[in-house]
Design a protein with these regions (language model features):
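Hydrophobic packing and interface segments
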Residues: 1-662
Length: 662
């Protein structure tokens, strides 16, 4: 059985080779007219410039954390693994974003020349590069680190590296994209009355750049962190559960998931008459079926039974069901979004109130599903089962990220088609692809939250084991634990306040700039004057880089401060409090934002007066409120709860040594 561990790095390399093949495949496609190429170049250069500037700042942060880990816990091997995790997360995000900004224009060109099927294939292939890089780098890194060290504690350093990059990528990307989006919508749509993706809008390029840095690179880093974190927790608990076999099993399951994701990619095929959504679902479901069957076989081989496989299947099924539930609350095909659209007829206030209500209601079923998953997994395999459920949920990350990253590529393709003045038939195709992309993006956010909850819980169990909380448990009547719980419960709200305020400040600057250009550049609204796109890109870039630091530093320092001052028990309370409120708040914000977005699109399809109506203006306001909800604060909370837990796990020896100052 021990030899099976080598499947992990081998399948990781296979995933990276498949990503390379898809990159070449996308690159060979026609990039369209000169105007299309010009617009795509603006988007590509803007995205690359932002990531380069962001990574320069992250180099300093990573270097400081490297020294703190080495000195703080006295283990430089863990510190080196931290560097590797940060490097791999950075590489996955950069490669995925780079290919996405090439796939967008080729998707638009395919829609123009070949129709729906070819456009879907290119957009999905571009997204699949991100997916394969996430699982490729994650599985290869985790596999090699464990093979070389056989030490789960060292492996937590690799996970912390992934988490550190993920937080800044998600927060920075989210602030960037939503500053541009809010500015473009409020001044362009509401004040000037021009359509979305209109080339007359100075913020339109920054908005399309934001799709890539936020929803491709940021989302990929988020799920890379969850993927690695689930493996770390499963390996840590697996050593206790079944020694070497317990540690190897999750790595082999992850390798199986990579194979299943590659197989699933070949099932994503559509035609001119079928729904692209069905094609994407076929790919995801086929990958899930392969993992279910394979996990039963592997469980029998490793443990001579099926209990461990059932824990994995619990996680996998819960992940799929959370995606379905998210679609019901955020898709225009269902009553919740239609209700918000109807409320828009009476103005922005009722639009916002209705969206908040839908978001709050949408927390119930996912939380119940997560609870059922935890109970089921624990019933069959104990605490190890909870970690396996997280591995199971994330086993098909390759195709999950591919489907999620497809969305912003399709959105960009529609923007390029609009700005290039392509015929309405082309925009009809890209609109269909984009509509599906909005739904898959919302489902992806739901999946990311569910996986973050299980991963954080599994890492929390690993932390409890590391500091010896299993023997005595956490005493909820201990004043230190209660203080920790209150502080932990508050942190997701404070974190969200920071990120929402950051978007507000950046959007204010963007709105002022767009208004200035409309007033001072002659003929801009008539299409005769040329907007200054670069100034808007610069505003988003500078704001995102400046504003991402405070939330990021808070996420790292809060658990260290509580652990040092109040001790390991209080820190356990903090992690538990943050997990409970963080998951609820993330679901609420992500689903409210998604519902507002699709209510606006539902009206734009001709309902309740269509584009330009009073209902549409109200829906645009709701969508604008929802933008930082669903693309900045909501997704970033996922990383907050995981990062605080992995920081606690890495620095557990230090907290035990100090034992608290009070």
């Amino acid at each position: 059985m021990e030899r099976l561990i080598y499947f992990a790095p081998v399948l990781g390399i296979c995933a990276l080779l498949f990503a390379f093949y898809l990159t070449k495949k996308v690159g060979k496609q026609d990039a369209g007219t000169d105007r299309m190429k010009e617009i795509a170049a603006f988007i590509h250069e803007g995205a690359r410039a932002f990531l380069t500037a962001e990574y320069k700042i992250l180099v300093v942060i990573v270097a400081v954390l490297f020294v703190l880990i080495g000195i703080g816990i006295g283990n430089w091997v863990t510190a080196v693994c931290f560097l590797v995790g940060a490097l791999f997360s950075t590489a996955a995000g950069y490669i995925g974003m780079n290919v996405a900004t090439k796939a967008n224009v080729r998707t638009a060109a395919a829609a123009k020349d070949s129709g729906m099927n070819k456009a879907l294939s290119i957009a999905f292939s571009g997204g699949a590069v991100m997916g394969m890089c996430v699982v490729g780098f994650g599985l290869f890194g985790a596999g090699v680190v464990y093979i070389l060290t056989k030490n789960p504690d060292v492996l937590s350093g690799f996970s912390l590296g992934a988490s550190s990059i993920a937080l800044f990528a998600r927060v920075g990307g989210g602030i960037y994209t939503k500053a541009a989006d809010v500015g473009a919508d409020l001044v362009g749509k509401v004040e000037a009355g021009i359509p979305e993706d209109d080339p007359r809008n100075p913020a339109v390029i920054a908005y399309n750049v934001g799709d890539n840095v936020g929803d491709v690179a940021g989302m990929g880093a988020d799920l890379f962190e969850s993927y690695v974190g689930s493996l770390v927790s499963a390996i840590t608990l697996g050593v206790v559960y079944a020694k070497e076999s317990g540690a190897i099993f999750p790595l082999v399951i992850a390798a199986l998931g990579v194979l299943a994701s590659v197989i699933g990619c070949f099932f994503v095929k559509g035609d001119e008459n079928s729904s692209p959504h069905k094609a994407l679902k076929y790919g995801s479901y086929s990958a899930a079926i392969v993992v279910m069957i394979g996990s039963l076989i592997l469980s029998k081989m490793f443990f001579n039974g099926f209990k461990e496989a059932i824990a994995i299947i619990f996680g996998l099924v819960v992940g799929l069901l959370i995606g379905v539930i998210t679609e019901i609350y955020t898709s225009g095909d269902y009553r919740f979004v239609k209700k918000i659209a109807q409320q828009s007829e009476t103005g922005p206030a009722t639009t916002v109130i209705s969206g908040i209500a839908v978001g709050m209601q949408s927390t119930a079923v996912p939380i119940i599903l997560i609870a059922i998953g935890i109970i089921g997994a624990y019933s069959f395999s104990g605490l190890y089962g909870i970690a396996l459920a997280a591995v199971g949920m994330l086993s098909t990350t390759g195709i999950t990220v591919a489907v999620d990253a497809y969305g912003p590529i399709a959105d960009n393709a529609g923007g390029i088609a609009e700005m290039s003045g392509l015929p309405s038939e082309v925009r009809n195709i890209t609109d269909k692809l984009d509509a599906v992309g909005n739904t898959t993006a919302a489902m992806g956010k739901g999946f990311a939250i569910g996986s973050a909850a299980l991963t954080a819980l599994a890492l929390f169990v690993s932390y409890a084991q590391a500091v010896g909380l299993f023997e005595e448990g956490i005493n909820l009547l201990d004043y230190k634990v209660i203080v920790g719980m209150f502080v932990g419960g508050m942190l997701p709200f404070l974190f969200s306040a920071f990120t929402m305020d950051s978007v507000s400040k950046a959007a204010y600057k963007m709105i002022e700039e767009v208004r200035r250009q409309f007033k001072t550049i002659p003929g801009i609204l008539e299409g005769k004057g040329k907007p200054d796109y670069k100034s808007c890109v610069a505003i988003s870039t500078q704001a995102a880089l400046k504003e991402m630091l405070l939330p990021g530093v808070m996420a790292v320092l809060a658990p260290v401060f509580i652990g040092v001052v109040l001790g390991p028990d209080a820190l356990g309370g903090l992690l538990g409090g943050a997990l409970v409120t963080g998951v609820m708040l993330a679901i609420f914000m992500s689903n409210s934002g998604g519902a507002w977005d699709n209510a606006k699109k539902y009206i734009e399809d001709g309902h309740h007066g269509g584009k330009g109506s009073e209902a549409h203006r109200a829906a645009v306001v709701g969508d604008t409120v929802g933008d930082p909800f669903k693309d900045t604060s909501g997704p970033s909370i996922n990383i907050l709860i995981k990062l605080m837990t992995i920081v606690s796990l890495v620095f557990a020896p230090l907290f035990l040594k100090i034992g608290g100052l009070f």
